[in-house]
Amino acid sequence: MLQDATCLDLFAGSGVLGMEAASIGAGHVVLVEQHAETAKHLAQSIDTLNLGNICTLKAADARSFLERCEAPFDVIFVDPPFADTGLLEAAVNSICEGGLLGQWLYLEFDQQQEAAVNALLLKHGLSLAKSTKAGATRSWLIQTAEQSKF
């Protein structure tokens, strides 16, 4: 799934999702992080791990980035801060309505958002491929309708 894939790590934070994708074969990973200090540490991690040829850091607000983004990504990781419950819905809507989702969408969210996330999947014709839970955190791997036919 990740071999040579173009990936987007939205709300990158520590960058663990995007850098892991890069380390196991992604072709290119864009990491988006709005907090300056976090982005600075993320840039240092990319440099330390010699991932600069695969990873591109965008120090930007996720919503603004999605509004300007034109190219689709094979895999998109969305793990927004749980405190702002509107971020997840806004991001998924922007991704789907902007034609940015190529094949796979990975979401991490609080269990209290599960019904809202299910509604988003229905709204955009997406399919849940795999789900896990750890305490109150839900992790869902979602595929596009086209991908689920294979």
Regions found by a protein language model. Give the residues of each.
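Class I S-adenosyl-L-methionine-dependent methyltransferase catalytic core
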Residues: 1-150
